[in-house]
Amino acid sequence: MPMFVDPKPPSQYLYFNFHPLRNASMSQELELKLLIAPEKRDQALKVCQSLADARSGTTQKTQFELRNSYFDTSDLRLRQFDMGLRIRSHKDQKEQTIKLAGRVMGGMHQRPEYNVNVDSEKPDLTLFDSEIWPDDFPVYDIQRDLETIFVTDFTRTRWRLPSGDGVIEMVLDEGQIQAGENSETISEIELELQGGSIDDAYHLAHQLVSKVEAKVGSLSKAARGYMLAGKSLLEPFTQMHYVPLEGDFTIGQALYRAVEYGLRHWQHNESCLLFNPSVRAVQGLADGIQLVRVALEQLIELGVGERQLLTNLAKITEQLQWLKNFEGLDELTAEDGAYHRALKRYEKLYESLQNSQEDVIRLNEVAEVVASARYQTTVLKLSQFLIEQEMTEELSQPVSPWCSQLLKSDWQLVQTAFSEHEKLNEEGYLKLLKPLQNSLLMGTCFGELFDDDVREKFRLPWQDLARGIREITALHILHERIKERDDDDLDRLLEWQKMQRESLLKALEYSRKAALKRDPYWFA
């Protein structure tokens, strides 16, 4: 069976708004998606009605049934073009919709869509304007091979709230996604801006988080449907790539892009954590948070953004500290690691390390953190921050000269710290790990603006150095585990791990001196 593994978060591809059926060509969707627990359905209805009444005093809810059939080819060619195709049925009306590539930022979904009323149960791509397709899009081949992938059936309760120069349409959807014999519950609230105020939409979202424990939703019904049908995999992102920047970007464009990139990485891994909990997903989530933090710090220094967001990110990160112990133990027990073969000879010690690794995992605690009001509020605030993208005169300046100076100033501090001592001990290296990692993340933000070869030649020894410093933690853990033992191997093990620590320090010293000789890439 063909399987599509998204190269970027699936939530960027397919998400559907809830406008009434209409004759129209193109619209730009802008909606906030929030998930609620099915058992909170009655409470959610009451809260939504209360919010609607408070805004207009006379808002009436309407309720109707919707059925959506989603189409693609067996080899998922629409999905590969970042497109989603459906036919929506409501009573005797049918509407055919194609969704093109868009973006998702903290639950806010933006995506162009094209709609046309139809009579058939099967979509006809030739009814859309031919100008919407990419140059290499094989319309007729795809049309010939279309088939139903999955369907959604749900009850929609809708309120239209006056806001700004338009309305915010608030809906509660309850029903099922069906793919063959597999089904999954739909229970979500969406807030669509139809000329309404962004501030109003986010204010409503914060109230729903507070009153019904709503969660920001980055996966659409369609993304979930593809997974349910076995057509798409949700895999954690384990590697942070350079933020995709262009040389003509302004400072603001580059920094907002970095925050958005980090948030997408974070939320994709959060979705992986909730659907299939794993340490890899938590690691990816933590990496995304750190990239957001680094870029956000620069924006705040330049006068935009709330410092409270940084405080919230720090508190979330504090609750992921167990990852350090897990990664240290993983360094010792991984089959492709440097210590596996030697430690495997000491069966009881090796089993103890493996058991300890399992014991430090806190996936349930991370799920509780993700569900917390603080976490959800932080994501919503970041989402609004990215949608609004406040600009100043300074943020409107070209990014290249600014980031070159930033990287230079930041690296001078790191370089001084690493070169002020002729020789560093373990504690000295551990103290320098955080500023080194921070500077490497700064390079992740802006590295795309520089020559690939020169950049990698400079970064590689520093990345090796960071990995080696983290390895010190692993050997500290090993030292403590060995001391807890009481058998004939104790002295031999202590001597062996002492040799490993001495060997590691020699390697770190070599890497440090090699790294300090490299010429910075930002002035190449």
Task: Locate the predicted segments by residue.
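Function-determining surface determinants
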Residues: 23-524
